[in-house]
Swiss-Prot record:
Residues under site feature: Important for substrate specificity: 11, 68, 153
Active site per the UniProt annotation: 67
Name of the protein this chain belongs to: dTTP/UTP pyrophosphatase
GO molecular function, one term: UTP diphosphatase activity
UniProt-listed Gene3D superfamilies: 3.90.950.10
SUPFAM superfamilies attached to this UniProt entry: ITPase-like (SSF52972)
Function as written in the Swiss-Prot or TrEMBL entry: Nucleoside triphosphate pyrophosphatase that hydrolyzes dTTP and UTP. May have a dual role in cell division arrest and in preventing the incorporation of modified nucleotides into cellular nucleic acids.
Biological processes annotated in GO: nucleotide metabolic process
Catalytically driven reaction(s): dTTP + H2O = dTMP + diphosphate + H(+); UTP + H2O = UMP + diphosphate + H(+)
Top-level taxon of origin: Bacteria
Subcellular location as annotated: Cytoplasm
Pfam (any one): Maf
Keywords: Cytoplasm, Hydrolase, Nucleotide metabolism
Amino acid sequence: MGLVLASESARRVELLRRAGYGFEARRSGFPEVVLDDPRETAVANARGKAEAVASTLPGEEVVLAADTVVYLPGEPGGILGQARDAGDVRRMLGLLEGRTHEVHSGVAVAGGGRVAVRHAVTEVRMRRLEPGEAEWYAACGEGVGKAGGYALQGRAAVFVEWIFGDYTNVVGLPLPLTIRMLRRFGVRPG
């Protein structure tokens, strides 16, 4: 039984490899949606990605998909997806600095005619940034393509005061949840 990761995200690939899994990574091609609720958004996108890839596979493969969004409670349109460019990174950091936000991930596993979907949430507190820090970070390019416009495992680690919950969720794939789900589908590391 093979494992297929419905993502080409370097962070998800690295996390899953570190956990000891062998797999093939594939782009899902699923058009992501943004709903009113961050949990529903992450879960709907994870399910859509898993089902899109599973529908192209003929055999016994198990498909793993995930979606991560950053949510800023109390902010109109508080769901922050992936930063598109340096300007987007600066804008998102401006919203997040000095506040606590939530990182929501949906995880979906499909195989054998069934789909399981779960959700993880982690709280992150970002400190107030010094003048020029947002520009410095945006210029390095690391935040482009990242939910909320930052990468906790990279240079943005210096902006974070604390996290409450699963660190790997903030990186892009909540490993404890993912491993439990994969086990239920008969997939183990090694």
